[in-house]
Each structure stands twice: as C-alpha cells, then as structure tokens.
C-alpha cells in the first residue's frame, strides 16, 4: 500500500488485517518532500513479497513520471489506484492537506487507466480488487455466470454485473439443455441460475461443471447464505474439484453470522477461491480482475498470464 494519506493507509491496513488479506508493506508519502510514487513503484514491482500494488493519491505536482512508471510496471504486476478529491470542496481539502495539485479526477483516472492501473472508487474496493488480483489468474472475457440458492441475491449480482459494464453470459444450447435435464422444473435454469429446489451436492457440482465447460462463460460467481442445506464447507470440495478442471475464475459471495464460516472461508481462499460478503463487492472485484486482464491483452507478452 502506497498512500498520500497516513489515515487511509491505516484504514486499508486495518481492514486487511480484519479480513485476513496479507500486506507486505504500508508506505505513507505525505507531502512527498523527497520520495514520490514514481520512486517507489520500480522497487515494489521487483519485490517478490508484493503480489499487487495499491495506490491512494490526492494529487501530483508532476504526474508524468508516475504514468511512465505505471506503463512499464503494470504488464508485470497489477496496480490498483484510487484518486480522492472528486468534488470542489474535497479538491480544496486535498490541496491544503498535502500541498499537491489535485486536479480533476476524471483526467487523473483516465490517465491512470491508460497507464494500465485498475481504477476504483472506494477504499474497500482497493482491498477487494487487490485481493483477487493476488489470488486469481486474470480473465480474458466479460461474460459472467451466476449461481445462487435464493432468487433475490442472484438479481442483486445481476444488477451489479450490468453496473460494472460486464455481461451476463448466454448459455449455449447444449449447456441449457443439460441444465434443463439436470435441475427440477421449479428451478430457474437460465442465467442467473437459482438452485433453491436442487439442494444436493451432486446437482450443485454438476451445475458448476456444466457452466464452467460452456465457452460462452468467462467467470462464475456463486452466492451462498449460511443454512443447513448448503454451507461453504459442503461446497468446498465440489468447487475445488471443478476449479482443477477449469482455468476460469470462480468467486464465492457468502455471508453468515460472525463465527460460523470463517474457517471454511480461509480454506477456500487458501485454495484460490476469493470470498466476499456482499454482491456489490464480489462483482466489483471481478470487474477489477477482468479490467486487468484487458490491460494484459493489450500489452506485449501479457497474454500468457491470462486464463484464455
């Protein structure tokens, strides 16, 4: 984490500790008297303990060295960036805080994207996107499949897919036919798939297999509330078996009262399945992964780091 604000660096670090996300280094630049973002990026890019770089910035007096460094580094290591000071009142506060030329956020964000950074809007999103980029191979496509055991959360996930500019995958005729035969009539068998009336581990695993095998699907998101029929512990083995057979990203959105699923979540994440607690956080993280995949697709030598 490299931040112009000591407070924000602590905010991100404390949340990372609370969520079990590893942090190698937390660096506060303040008013950047003699060290700036561009000075630190090459070091962090070559640091084997750093899987992803988080930047929080308020403004830059001379931004061109930063953008040059980002263009060189982002094909090798992901960078997630947030620019604060989006409104007139906060722009003034940013300038008085660090003495930097804050500038319009739209211009900064466009330049950051052009340089290969994944731009986010909130501190929580910094951490969520950095987590998935440290765990999952970037995806090459924007077609998302959603599975849930309740209709409402599936709709929330679908809303966020559209909000992030992603696409709900249209299953192939073969996949749709196989799902129609596998799942009972009351189940919603189109995307998003509602598994409410098919709560068996066998049906769950076969549904995951069919969806991941579909060439129209680039990533799979599974929503799960804690209940006796299907817990993160019960789906762990089926999901991990199918993960071994597919290079496509799989994300889990899971929630429960505190203390019930933490151990299972740790085990899933240790196996490369990122877990988030709310639909919006899950899809925003996936969108960040996909945007970094698009950065790699556009850079020379980046294609081999992608899922397909």
Q: What is the predicted role of each segment?
A:
Residues 2-308:
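Catalytic-core regions of core metabolic enzymes
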């Amino acid at each position: 984490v490299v931040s112009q604000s000591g407070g924000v660096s602590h905010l991100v670090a404390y949340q990372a500790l609370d969520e079990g996300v590893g942090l190698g280094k937390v660096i506060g630049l303040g008013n950047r008297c003699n060290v700036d973002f561009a000075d630190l990026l090459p070091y962090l890019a070559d640091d084997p303990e750093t899987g992803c770089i988080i930047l929080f910035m308020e403004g830059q007096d001379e931004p061109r060295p930063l953008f040059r460094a980002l263009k060189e580094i982002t094909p090798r290591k992901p960078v997630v960036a947030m620019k604060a000071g989006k409104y007139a009142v906060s722009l003034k506060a940013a300038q008085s805080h660090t003495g930097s030329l804050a500038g319009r956020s739209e211009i900064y964000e466009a330049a950051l994207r052009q340089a290969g950074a994944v731009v986010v809007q909130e501190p929580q999103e910094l951490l969520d996107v950095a987590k998935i980029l440290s765990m999952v191979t970037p995806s090459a496509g924007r077609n998302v499949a959603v599975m849930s055991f309740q209709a409402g959360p599936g709709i929330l996930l679908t809303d966020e897919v559209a909000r992030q500019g992603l696409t709900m995958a249209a299953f192939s005729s073969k996949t749709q036919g196989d799902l129609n035969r596998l799942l009972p009539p009351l189940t919603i068998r189109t995307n998003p798939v509602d598994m409410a009336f098919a709560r068996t581990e066998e049906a769950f695993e076969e549904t995951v297999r069919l969806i991941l095998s579909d060439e129209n699907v680039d990533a799979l998101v599974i929503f799960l509330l804690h209940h006796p029929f299907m817990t993160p512990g019960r789906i762990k083995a089926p999901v991990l078996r199918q993960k071994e057979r597919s290079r496509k990203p799989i994300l889990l959105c899971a929630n429960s009262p505190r203390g019930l699923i933490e151990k299972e979540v740790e085990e899933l994440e240790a196996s490369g399945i990122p877990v988030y607690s709310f639909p919006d956080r899950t899809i925003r993280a996936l969108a960040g992964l996909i945007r970094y995949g698009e950065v790699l697709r556009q850079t020379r030598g980046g294609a081999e780091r992608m899922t397909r």
